[in-house]
Amino acid sequence: MGLLAYLLVVLLILNVFFAAVTVFLERRDTSATWAWLLVLTFVPIFGFIIYLIFGRKLSGKKIFDWKGQEKIGIQESTANQIEMIRQKEFPFSDSNVKKHRDLIYLLLVNDGAILTQDNEVELFIDGHEKFDALIADIEKAKDHIHLIYYIFHSDELGNRLMRVLERKAAEGLNVKIIYDAMGSRTTKKSFFRTFEKNGGLVRPFFPSKLPLINFRLNYRNHRKLAIIDGDISYIGGFNIGDEYLGLSKKFGYWRDTHLRVHGKAVYAMQTRFIMDWNSASSTNKIDYKPRYFPTFHGKGHTSMQIVSSGPDSEWQQIKNGYIKMINAAKKTIYLQSPYFIPDASLLEAIKIAALSGVDVRVMIPNKPDHAFVYRATTNYAGELMETGAKIFIYDNGFIHAKTLVVDGEIASVGTANMDFRSFRLNFEVNAFIYEKKMVQKLEDAFLEDILKSYQLTPELYAKRSLWIKFKEAVSRLLSPIL
């Protein structure tokens, strides 16, 4: 045996040994473990490099600092709500909110998600309307503007927004931007130069610490939040880019869901931004000052909780909320997600609901955003049809909304897709809503989307080619790590 062949054998043995040790020592889902073992076995050496970049769990080092929240009474308010609900003394605003106190309690205990009941909420399903409203609110800002977006493109929409932010920073307002280093990888730092020169501050989330190498590449901040003067906020699925206005030739019309909130729920989104900023920035840390949490009384009646989740937590708070909602369903479950790759627990919950006679409708796109992810999505959809669930293919552009509406009584809107990545790898944020009027608007939007969709029937699904079936099988196998 030549020296080169000998070294290759040694490398292969070491690859298998270290790969197995590394994968099994890290606490993770069994399906993800098997998926990584397949990659490491069939793509030796290079597969281990892929694993080091994409597969390693985050270190045990604390990512977010909770210190300072006692100044505005967050922990005290959370503890008080937990105790009052436990003692059945909490003053729920109406019978529908009270009916779902188990879900509210779960999210309180799991995530510290305080229930607020004074919110005015406006629904946006069109990018033009959402960004017109956001920019109008930014124009009226008097004290501060906080933005966090997974994608912040330097295209026409990005420039339009940036010009306003530059002007507000020059006026002396406190303006801060967080963008995800991977999601906004095509946006050059020079795009923010004038903004920073005018006094604005910008930070990338989880940037590479080494040239061309980022061992945290797989963990992305997928949140989309805007907080203006501490009393108005935006949460939902729209990123900043021309494609979100329907200007992409590939995707066409972009259908998404976003909320504008005025009420105490803004405090929770402000807290989320501060924690993310202080994690992303080594300087110019934000303290929990009264200016960021102004005293006001919301005039709305929408009860909601703001729930965050991410790889820094073992609890998968948003997914647990989804499962609790699905298990509570008696009549209808309407679900929209561009990526439908549920883990075993979520898939089982949806199947049981469908088999129990609940009208389960799942809406997915008619075109791939990511090829492997799309084929995994259609494979899971095919399996779900066997239980009587109805699958609808949105045929009026691209559906990017992440919404779950149950029984016309409760709903969730936010950034989390129905997939492994959103539940285990990404930092996400969702609003859980308990007011019937707002939930009805979301249900109406879903039913309107059905008119622009076609149903994927078992007969239609059976006609897919052998090549498509093969791609689905491979994608399904790798779905835990996509």
From Swiss-Prot:
Record keywords, A-Z: Cell membrane, Lipid biosynthesis, Lipid metabolism, Membrane, Phospholipid biosynthesis, Phospholipid metabolism, Repeat, Transferase, Transmembrane, Transmembrane helix
Database matches in SMART domains: PLDc
Annotated GO CC locations: plasma membrane
Gene Ontology BP annotations: cardiolipin biosynthetic process
Any GO molecular function: cardiolipin synthase activity
Domain of life: Bacteria
Protein name, per record: Cardiolipin synthase
Organism of origin: Listeria welshimeri serovar 6b (strain ATCC 35897 / DSM 20650 / CCUG 15529 / CIP 8149 / NCTC 11857 / SLCC 5334 / V8)
Gene this chain is encoded by: cls
